[in-house]
Each structure stands twice: as C-alpha cells, then as structure tokens.
Amino acid sequence: MAVEDKVKTLYEDGIVALKGAFYVEWVEAMREDMMTAFWSAIQRPGGAVGRGPRRWYVEIHPQDFRGFADLAAHPWVVEMAGAVCGPKFEIVEIGFDVPFQGAKNQPWHRDFPSPTDTYVDKRITSLAFNLTGVDVTPDMGPFEIAIGTQWEDGRSWNHEMFPTKEEWPKFAERGVRKFPQRGDISCRSALTIHRGTAHGSPIARPVMVLGIDAPGAGHSALHDMMMTKDYHDALPETVRQHLICRVVETLVPISQKHDIEGLVMGAE
C-alpha cells in the first residue's frame, strides 16, 4: 500500500499499521532493552510513571535502545512522518508502556488535549509510532482504540482528555482491540480515543513509543530527550536533523514530565 493510502487510512481511522517491518531478532533486542530500562527506572523517583495498576510508562535515552537509529530511519516511519507532519517533522519522544499481570482496564482517553488544528481544521499534527515487544494474545490486555475518534472536540472532558463515563459506550461501540506481532509498526494519532485493557497473562507486554511532532505542535515540552555528543554525531544526518534533544557530556536519569493524572487509578 502506497504511503498516500496509509495516510488516508490514518485520517479515516486514527491508526494504520505496517506488518513485518523488522525481524523478530531485532524486536527481541528491543524487548530486552525495554525491560532492562524498566527495572532501572522503577527504582528511582520519577523514573517510571504509573498509568494505572500494574502499568507504567518509561522514557528512555535513545542510546539505551540499540535499535533507535533503525527505527527513526525506517523508510515507512520517515515517509509517514513527512507526509503527515511535514518535511521538518520533529522526533520528540522515545519511551515505552508496559502492563504486567493484574493491570486493569484504563478509562477511555486521549494522550493530550486536541489542538484547534485538529478539532477545527481536521489536521493531524503529531504521531505515535508503536512497536510491540511480544506477539500479543487476547489475555495480554491488548490496546483498544475507538476508530475515527481523533476528530472529537473534547474541550468539555476532564482535562480535555477523558470522556465522561456516560460517553464510554459510544467509544466501546467503535473500539477495536489490536493484536500486533513482533516486527509490526503502528502509526496513530494520540488523540484517537483508546485504552489499555485488563492484563491477565503472566507475560508482560512492553510496547515502544516513538513520538513525532509537526513544527509548532509543542509536545517536546513534555519530554527531555538527551544523548551524548559521540552518540549524536554517529547518527545518520537523516535522523539528526529531526531530533529535538539536548546533547550532553554525561547522561542523567530522566525525570518524566508527561504524567497523565487520570490514568493513575485505572477505570475499574
């Protein structure tokens, strides 16, 4: 499917995917890096942010993810980012979600308030690329997304992100649970209403998140990407030119800024 068709699907559904973008061996290394980063982050204040019971989000340094350059330079990622967010798109976030056994249904939500560019002008100005670390099965609390809801205004919602419970049935009717396999990439608007679901499996389900902005979208203020100069200089220029990050002598632990208060307790 041509990138134009993928963009059309994204604008209609709020999400689109590419199957088999990476080899399983590459994904296994990504999963190992995510879980190593999780066990480090959970031990320090602000390192892992709760997104509900037994569910966390962790931002990582790009150089702690061996596949960062591969992901940021992947032709489909670059094509989608350029087509949706423009040729000067910005890479503003790298991190991962991980639910464990006992994670509950999240409330239906979006990840930040909708800008007028989206709810008035019907333009998508930011993207989240997701890569699962495991082959997702029904007992792993699959990601559920309410198709086509990225255009909802949302200004009357709690924090402009959380629809009222009275509205949940509307989103449930449009909800589709996703079962990606290792190597797949999805691309979504984080404004499309979604939730993580109850996780009964003893196997954790980490999923990598690469955040992309159009210039001016402003989400870099929610993050603090940093890398050392030698790592930065070794990246391909095609990646470097899109990075919104600090170049530092020594990496320091990330203290996360994007805490979504309404997710802390879960929905049930």
Task: Walk through the language-model features, giving the residues of each.
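Double-stranded beta-helix
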Residues: 136-197
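Active-site glycine-rich loop that binds ribose-phosphate moieties when present
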Residues: 110-117, 131, 163-171
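Generic beta-strand structural signal
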Residues: 87-94, 104-106, 123-131, 141, ...
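Short edge-strand/loop segments of extracellular domains
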Residues: 100, 146-153, 211-217
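Non-heme Fe(II)-dependent double-stranded beta-helix
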Residues: 1-13, 18-119, 223
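Short, conserved beta-strand element in jelly-roll/cupin
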Residues: 118-138, 179-182, 187, 210-214
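Short, structured patches in soluble enzyme cores that scaffold and shape functional sites
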Residues: 98, 110-112, 131-135, 147, ...
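Non-heme Fe(II)/2-oxoglutarate
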Residues: 192-268
